[in-house]
Curated annotation (Swiss-Prot):
It comes from Arthroderma benhamiae (strain ATCC MYA-4681 / CBS 112371). The keyword Glycoprotein applies. It is found in: Secreted. Glycans are attached at N96, N252, N485, N605, N699. This is Probable dipeptidyl-peptidase 5. The keyword Magnesium does not apply. Residues 1-19 form the signal peptide. Extracellular dipeptidyl-peptidase which removes N-terminal dipeptides sequentially from polypeptides having unsubstituted N-termini. Contributes to pathogenicity. SUPFAM superfamilies: alpha/beta-Hydrolases, DPP6 N-terminal domain-like. Keywords: Aminopeptidase, Glycoprotein, Hydrolase, Protease, Secreted, Serine protease, Signal, Virulence. It comes from the Eukaryota. GO terms for cellular component: extracellular region. InterPro entries: 6-blade_b-propeller_TolB-like, AB_hydrolase_fold, PD40, Peptidase_S9_cat. Residues 269-291 are annotated as: Disordered.
Amino acid sequence: MAAAKWLIASLAFASSGLAFTPEDFISAPRRGEAIPDPKGELAVFHVSKYNFDKKDRPSGWNLLNLKNGDISVLTTDSDVSEITWLGDGTKVVYVNGTDSVKGGVGIWISDAKNFGNAYKAGSVNGAFSGLKLAKSGDKINFVGYGQSTTKGDLYNEAAAKEAVSSARIYDSLFVRHWDTYVSTQFNAVFSGALTKNGDKYSFDGKLKNLVQPVKYAESPYPPFGGSGDYDLSSDGKTVAFMSKAPELPKANLTTSYIFLVPHDGSRVAEPINKRNGPRTPQGIEGASSSPVFSPDGKRIAYLQMATKNYESDRRVIHIAEVGSNKPVQRIASNWDRSPEAVKWSSDGRTLYVTAEDHATGKLFTLPADARDNHKPEVVKHDGSVSSFYFVGSSKSVLISGNSLWSNALYQVATPGRPNRKLFYANEHDPELKGLGPNDIEPLWVDGARTKIHSWIVKPTGFDKNKVYPLAFLIHGGPQGSWGDNWSTRWNPRVWADQGYVVVAPNPTGSTGFGQKLTDDITNDWGGAPYKDLVKIWEHVHNNIKYIDTDNGIAAGASFGGFMVNWIQGQDLGRKFKALVSHDGTFVGSSKIGTDELFFIEHDFNGTFFEARQNYDRWDCSKPELVAKWSTPQLVVHNDFDFRLSVAEGVGLFNVLQEKGVPSRFLNFPDETHWVTKPENSLVWHQQVLGWVNKWSGINKSNPKSIKLSDCPIEVVDHEAHSYFDY
């Protein structure tokens, strides 16, 4: 047990005297959502911690006492990939990745109070996850998901025959999506049942594919779909799942439906909100999400956007009666926020929803029959909500969340009452020592068209009488935001503790401030958002004395990377000592190489061949812009980034080098749009922070700051001079 002490939060901090370092950031325990038992006494959650010495990330499962916040170890077995409550006291079902079936998983049953006394209920012949269970007579019905073959069988990669050729052949889109070349396998929801024999349950290994009978359907939908894409009714008889519209081109449109199907697969799944269908509200043909049955199984709530090719349209709550032909009802449809998840109260009268509001993921409640103009009420909690579950049959919910100052916040929230704190990681984990809300504050500035929000993040030991270089961090999306939540990649506090004051703006295009601000970036990528950033920089320069803009730096990823490339060719580019562009577009016309065409076709008001002028308008590679380049720039781009090809980063670096602009190219051949592997993440931080620290002067003012020389990776440098030195 001593080897697993990290699984339980330490009660005292180690006295290192150092600020929050990349090593602290990467090695801090990472905790998953806490799921309460049926009685609301205990909650189970996953935890892992990277070990730089051993180069591994052991994981396990903990129990959270919902009365006093105490944490205890349930298991240190890293092969246990998920645990869910059986619905019978403290009994649990878990999936173990090691099984007698090669490439399969085992379904095990145990008791949280005696976890070691587990027994195996059966095996699944392939990768399988996302268990949801409901009692149905003398059985426990369940659903989960895995990959399906074209014939409808659960795909087992380990048992698959090796192809005679590596060729890929396509007659339709997608060719590749996010980080993967699309294959003939696809995600599908499968159903099965646990049968009780005496005091034990068994599984016969038989699964029913509920998705494959609908040609071209897929659920959960990649790349980010999961168990939130489907639900099982409380009686275990009906399954709902979300799929992209099977009859429409998936790369061009976002339209998706909520399908209903019997758990036993006795009928083919049918959509309840098909485009132009008899039950679907007029004009509603966008993306659907978050299907969830009411407690009695008679209704289903889900979220849907209106626009068919816009992934960042406003979601609206919809409710449909199951087994009825009545029109689907829209709930609080005029609320100018975009819900992300929805759940029913135990009596079916109230809906609990999460939505981003002013850069914070908040929890709201509203009546299940709320009229169009109803404004949901906020439930008090700290930080941003990642997930929530009801505590027993009460109105209280267990929130798993985080913030800019803590990577895990477990708390109980009840409408109309103060929240009750159970466990905040920053108060226990040595790696997060010193982090807290006092170093974070909002900033509002008049932007190009409206007031624009930013976060100011200060370093450990901040002194208002001292001066700190500006770190101007630009978020991606572009329809995204810097929220009051923890990032495991771009974390403002890591930057601040190098010796900067971070300003993280939410310019035009950002989410959570009303749909108009989000929509206003359409066909205006380098317009209003750039003007917002200029005005924020000017406000900081003129009004905040403790921020040194003369030695400031700017950095961004994805859209933020584009904006850094755009800034390099604008007047604002001359205001920074260094720039960092991570996975940002460079050549306007290269956007046609992306995966999700609906994204660019919405944001640039047309297809590549019909609206070419819109793609070219915000082209960072225009000669008149390149002529202005002079600020040292680090370019980061990875091989498995299929959102925008690595050639974008190489091309950008080519021009910087030929222009004689101090520059460096950082590439990870095994990473995607994001850098997620721990050792790669450390190198990323060493290079990115080392780069800006060199040019901003931080290396001189803060001896403990990261230097480029801290990185052990050898630099490829075959030339002594720039091309134009000759």
